[in-house]
Design a protein with these regions (language model features):
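Short secondary-structure junctions
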Residues: 29-36, 90-96
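Mid-chain, well-packed structural core segment of small domains
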Residues: 64-85
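Short beta-strand micro-motifs in enzyme catalytic cores
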Residues: 43-45, 69, 100-104
């Protein structure tokens, strides 16, 4: 029986960890958490998101801009997030409406699709 979600993983290009940290920690405000010693040599970094984590791994060889795969961050005050991201030059794409939520999406600096979603 599956009892929950432990973590999700996204990827960035090999060697792009500092750019990734800047975007995910400085711009989005997520907290970096320590990776286990056994995984530190593999590149990437981990982020705390509420009571779960997002693992940012490194991987080359594909175009992240062509995939629909994404992660959705549950937020408060969606319009504040939209304004903050636009101030950083990030293009906002309106999401297809779904009942009970407002949302939008954008691409991170590496092409990963990211969604911000708020309950209404």
């Amino acid at each position: 029986m599956i009892i929950g979600l432990h973590h999700a993983q996204i990827t960035i290009p090999k060697g792009a960890e500092e750019r990734g940290r800047h975007f995910y920690c400085d711009i989005l405000g997520l907290e970096e958490i320590e990776k286990p010693d056994s995984l530190k040599g593999r590149g990437g970094f981990w982020l705390q998101v509420g009571d779960r984590s997002v693992h940012v791994g490194t991987e080359d060889g594909f175009d992240r801009r062509t995939t629909k795969a994404h992660i959705a961050y549950l937020v408060e005050n969606l319009s504040d997030w939209k304004n903050a991201l636009e101030q950083h030059g990030i293009q906002i794409l309106e999401g297809v409406p779904i009942p009970g939520f407002d949302r939008f999406e954008f691409r991170d600096p590496f092409g990963n699709r990211v969604e911000m979603i708020q309950e209404v």
